[in-house]
Regions:
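Metallocofactor- and cofactor-centric catalytic cores in central/energy metabolism, strongly enriched
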Residues: 1-400, 407-468
Length: 468
């Protein structure tokens, strides 16, 4: 049983509380989202939240004391020896014949947006692709497709080895993404990421919808590019939405700017939705591997077979070995914002983070840059950094990223990035950032009711409703 509790609102020192029959008087002010002790702690005694240790007491603490990063220390150290202890997953979730309005592509895949993307092979042409996107927007007055977007980046040259290969993989995944109704790939000509080699690297693609321009090989790159874009626009603008079963939806699960409510409201909501989507035959993807440390065995024991278990061990230990090889401790993850919001250790963050994927079996484990092959719950190799992780989720083929936040963030990647607030204060203060408020879950709306509303909203977004 948990031996700390979380304050839903700011609680003053001297407040008398009854928690699960335990009478408590608070010894100090407890900010909303933060923990207080339900018992007296001896130095070194484990602090339990979500039913698992989140660290140990650095010093003796009294019942009613504020428990935070100053008095809780992580239990995480180096590499661990893991044992496969599979559990039986039994989820009684009814199948519903739900559909959304998506775009059926020539290869049979489905997109939830119909956008024209301009993707550079190298950062040297960033200015050109921006001019082209703006030019097409002016000509079309923003009509006919969902968006016309240039995707500048700083890579594609002065890169070798894995760095270069990873750049190629992510750019390939973008070019092939079904949310793009048409793509213009713009190269320079002398870069490491050679356009003709990159073209071969794509594998099969729709040559009517993916075009290339090498700027060193044309006279006026703006006029040449606009001519190609007009042709792509003429084709993409004829695409229409059609009914698509929910089983074809793929979502990425992400959190950033987490707080003490993340593991109580928004992340469990995503977990409930993920289980529902998987029960309908759909797909969800969890990443942020370093933020699994401390909760990884929960995922390992839900792997469908021992091969997936071994792949998950490799996924976890690869990141741990990377940190250790650079002299970095594996447990120093929580940011200043996390701590201010009530998260004290990486274990606490991880136990909240992994709730986003519900209770379903793990059916796939993916390296960085790989595209989705299996339905169900997939684990994807990427760091906790919001920009990298969200982009990797989108590159894997996710139609949208479901992003929970307690502190707030405006970031979005190249697919619809829905922000779900963990608390109502954030939703009220940042309506331009937040798309869905999960804070109502601690305001007496049952999780099941919130999830029903969330499912309806996801279907609307998949069918074309824009997010902030």
């Amino acid at each position: 049983a948990d031996n700390v509790a979380v304050a839903i609102v700011n609680l003053p020192a001297g407040e008398h509380l009854s928690v699960d029959g335990i009478e408590i008087t608070l010894n100090e002010d407890i900010p909303a989202g933060h923990k207080f002790a339900l018992k007296n702690f001896a130095e070194g005694e484990n602090v339990i939240k979500y039913g698992y240790p989140i660290g140990h007491a650095r010093m003796a603490k009294k019942q009613g004391d504020w428990m935070n990063e100053t008095n809780i220390k992580t239990n995480l150290a180096g590499l661990l020896d893991y044992t496969y202890n599979p559990i039986q997953v039994s989820l009684d979730i009814p199948h519903k014949d739900l559909t959304f309005k998506g775009y059926r592509r020539k290869n049979g895949d489905v997109g939830v947006r119909n956008e024209i993307w301009i993707i550079p092979t190298v950062g040297c042409v960033n200015g050109i692709i921006g001019q082209l996107a703006e030019g097409l927007r002016r000509e079309t007055e923003g009509k006919g497709v969902d968006a016309i977007v240039a995707f500048p980046h700083n890579y594609g040259c002065s890169q070798l080895g894995d760095d270069h290969e990873n750049t190629k993989k992510i750019l390939r995944d973008m070019v092939l993404h079904p949310n793009a109704g048409a793509v213009l790939v713009v190269g320079l000509g002398c870069e490491n990421n050679q356009p003709d080699v990159f073209r071969e690297f794509l594998g099969e693609f729709d040559e009517d919808r993916v075009k290339f321009m090498v700027t060193q090989k044309v006279g006026d790159e703006y006029e040449e590019g606009m001519e190609i874009l007009r042709d792509l626009y003429a084709k993409a603008s004829k695409d229409e939405r059609t009914d698509v079963p929910l089983s074809e939806l793929r979502v990425g699960l992400k959190c950033g700017g987490s707080d003490g409510f993340s593991g109580i409201t928004a992340n469990p909501l995503l977990g409930m939705f993920s289980d529902f989507l998987i029960a309908q035959g759909g797909t969800s993807v969890l990443t942020e591997v370093p933020e699994m440390f401390g909760a990884e065995t929960i995922l390992m024991n839900r792997c469908k077979n021992e091969e997936l278990f071994e792949q998950t061990v490799h996924l976890i230990n690869d990141f741990k070995e990377y940190f250790l090889s650079h002299g970095e401790p594996v447990g120093e993850n929580p940011s200043p914002g996390n701590k201010a919001g009530g998260i004290s250790t990486l274990e606490e963050k991880a136990l909240g983070c992994t709730q986003k994927c519900g209770k379903s079996y793990v059916s796939g484990v993916m390296p960085y840059g790989e595209r989705l092959q299996k339905k169900g719950l997939n684990l994807l190799s990427a760091p906790g950094n919001d920009l990298v992780a969200a982009t990797t989720l989108a590159a894997s083929g996710c139609h949208m990223v479901l992003f929970t936040t307690g502190r707030g963030t405006p970031f979005g990647t190249f697919v619809p990035t829905m922000k779900i607030s963990t608390n109502s204060t954030l939703a009220k203060n940042k309506p331009g950032w937040i798309d869905f408020n999960a804070g109502v879950i601690v305001e007496n709306e049952p999780m099941e009711k919130t999830c029903e509303r969330f499912i309806d909203y996801i279907i609307k977004v998949a069918s074309g409703e824009f997010v902030n």
